[in-house]
């Protein structure tokens, strides 16, 4: 039996606004581990980074990488895997996730959700993008949202889609 090994996750707090959320790093780490445990992704010897930034930081990333000059709640950047064989001891890079504080806070407040629940959802959502899930087509969206619900239920977070549209 193979033992589950979560990915090594580095959480980088790059905007002072996150200092108001003392548990943000622990929330993100718990959400990533839960998501990794419930997917078929091989996360042993894998690494990813989560950047907790502000709306301006996410807006810059969104403009540079997606051509959309506005902030959003979460962005995921799956790592390109190198061609050829990597050294046996090289970690597998899953990619990077960026989460915008002001948008996350505003959405949680507008939807009457606890901030930690919404942050958990965005971390799970971002991780699923790194391991190949998407929501461009209806069938993909249904599969991704169903898995998000299952993962979040394991974390004690209610269905995030019960009263809203999909995460961008």
Swiss-Prot record:
SUPFAM superfamilies: Metalloproteases ('zincins'), catalytic domain (SSF55486). It is found in: Cytoplasm. One of its GO terms (molecular function) is zinc ion binding. It comes from the Bacteria. Zn(2+) binds at residues 125, 129, 135. GO terms for cellular component: cytoplasm. Its EC number is 3.1.-.-. GO terms for biological process: rRNA processing. Its cofactor is Zn(2+). Keywords: Cytoplasm, Endonuclease, Hydrolase, Metal-binding, Nuclease, Ribosome biogenesis, rRNA processing, Zinc. Binds 1 zinc ion. Belongs to the endoribonuclease YbeY family. Single strand-specific metallo-endoribonuclease involved in late-stage 70S ribosome quality control and in maturation of the 3' terminus of the 16S rRNA. This is Endoribonuclease YbeY. It comes from Rhodopseudomonas palustris (strain BisB18). The lineage of its organism: Bacteria, Pseudomonadati, Pseudomonadota, Alphaproteobacteria, Hyphomicrobiales.
